[in-house]
Each structure stands twice: as C-alpha cells, then as structure tokens.
Regions:
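Short, residue-level hotspots on alpha-helical faces of the histone-fold
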Residues: 67, 71, 147, 201-202
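Short, low-complexity, polar/charged sequence segments that are solvent-exposed and flexible
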Residues: 62-64, 117-122, 193-197
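Generic recognition of cysteine residues
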Residues: 59, 98, 131, 185-187, ...
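Conserved kinase catalytic-core segment
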Residues: 124-183, 188
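Conserved ATP-binding subdomain of kinase catalytic cores across diverse folds
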Residues: 1-111
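ATP-dependent phospho-/nucleotidyl transfer catalytic cores
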Residues: 90-144, 206-211, 219-222, 234
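Short secondary-structure boundary segments
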Residues: 16-51, 113-135, 224-240
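C-terminal catalytic region of ATP-dependent kinase domains
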Residues: 165-246
C-alpha cells in the first residue's frame, strides 16, 4: 500500500462527524467512513476549526508514527495519507486526510480497555497490573515506550481497544492506533514551533501510569528488549518520505 497519495483525490462525498476530542482544545476532529472495493475504510481529518478551517497536522503525525512503528517492529494500524478535496458544511477544503482499514476480523467485537477493566477487574489492581494479569504486559510496555518517543498526549482508555471473538473464544488487544496528538501537535505557528522544547516532559492524558510519558517508563522492567527493530540515522528518509509540502 502506498503510504502517501500526492495526486489530489475527490473525496467530497464522505459525511464528516465529530470524533472524540479529549485534548482540551476548542476545535474538533472530524471522522468519516466509506468503502473501497467492498472494504470498509475509515477517514479522519486533522484539527478542524469552524472559522479557520483545517489547521492541524495530526494526519501527518499518523504517517510518521506508522513508519516508525514499522521500523521498530511494533504491531500497529497502518494509515494512508491522501491529498484530497473534501466538503464540510457546503464548503470545499483542499487538505490531507488519513485513511485506514478495519483492524477487526470476521466475528470480532470490540470494547475499550477502560470498559473492559471496569467490568472484569477483580479488586483494586491498577490498570497496569490488570493488563499484566491478562497477559498483555509486553504489549503495554511497548505502547508506553512508543508514547514516550512520540510524546503522545492522548492515550486515554478509549484509545486502547480489546477485541473479542466468541466463535474463536479469544480475547486480544487491538494493534496500536490513533497517534495524531503527538510530536508538535500543539504548535500552529512558526513562533510556537521555534519555542517548543522537545526534551520537556509534558502532562498527557494516560490510561496507564502517570500523566508523564517519561515517568511511565519506570513501569518497564526490561527496557532493552522492547523493540524488535532498531532506529538508524538513515531511517529519517523513510520517516519523512513524500511529506514535503504536506
């Protein structure tokens, strides 16, 4: 699958609805869905302001994290970045949108980890302890490390999903997804970009651990065995390929 489609597509037909915005900002994140060759496709926009239009860069962040996860050998939902004309409230916007396939397989139903925890916890175990008891420690440790690397601001309990399949009698965690609110997502001007300290620890909404992505690393016992792959200097070209002008 080609990660970035630069040639502009006509995607004015999808109807956009409000997605969950837990970042504390006044704007919104719009989502939609469609079908390509009979396969369901999910679309989402970057940060949208009703007066200023689409001013965020969350969709570009998704592609960068997608590529980073692939290099590191992390199971994740794959995204495609598409240059497109879209229509919101009878107004056409020239923008970039993210597209992804459904990570559920036939017979799967999904619930948030937050809900799964509330229904199935046995006592006062922490979110991290609960995941460990269910055999998901490696997954969670990997997620914590990824969130630290990208400064993910929004790993709430609905951004981690549990998949059930009654026919297969299986319960598993969904691949990592939804990484738009990361990197420099809070910067909308050149001045804000210049002032942003990439080494500063910032408060984030986390379902597991504290509000600090750095402090959460203390939960990981074997930090040297987190990733199957290794990030190299030359991988910069892969991470940012075809993103000039986005």
């Amino acid at each position: 699958m080609k990660k970035v489609i630069v040639e502009k597509q006509d995607l004015r037909h999808p109807k956009w609805s409000h997605g969950r915005n837990s970042s504390g900002t006044a704007g919104t994140f719009l989502k939609s869905q469609g079908s390509v060759n009979g396969e369901k496709i999910y679309y989402k926009l970057s940060y949208f302001d009703s007066e200023k239009g689409i001013i965020g860069h969350e969709c570009a962040n998704e592609i960068i994290v997608d590529r980073l996860s692939g290099i590191l050998g992390v199971e994740h939902l794959e995204y495609q970045l598409i240059h497109a004309d879209i229509e919101i409230d009878d107004k056409v916007y020239d923008t970039w949108i993210c597209a992804s396939k459904d990570f559920k397989t036939r017979g799967d139903t999904k619930t948030t980890l937050d809900n799964f925890y509330q229904v199935n916890r046995l006592g006062n175990e922490s979110h991290y302890e609960f995941c460990n008891e269910n055999g998901w420690r490696k997954y969670i440790d990997t997620m914590l490390a990824v969130d630290y690397l990208i400064l993910n601001r929004d790993r709430h309990g609905a951004n981690i999903e549990v998949l059930r399949n009654s026919k297969k009698r299986s319960i598993r965690i969904a691949p990592l997804f939804d990484h738009g609110l990361s990197f420099l997502c809070s910067c909308y001007t050149e001045e804000e970009l210049d002032k942003f300290d990439i080494l500063m620890d910032r408060p984030c909404q986390n379902f597991i651990g504290s509000r600090s992505t750095y402090d959460k690393l203390k939960l990981i016992e074997n930090k040297s065995d987190i990733f199957a792959g290794k990030l190299r200097v030359q991988d910069e070209e892969i991470l940012f390929r075809d993103l000039d002008g986005v």
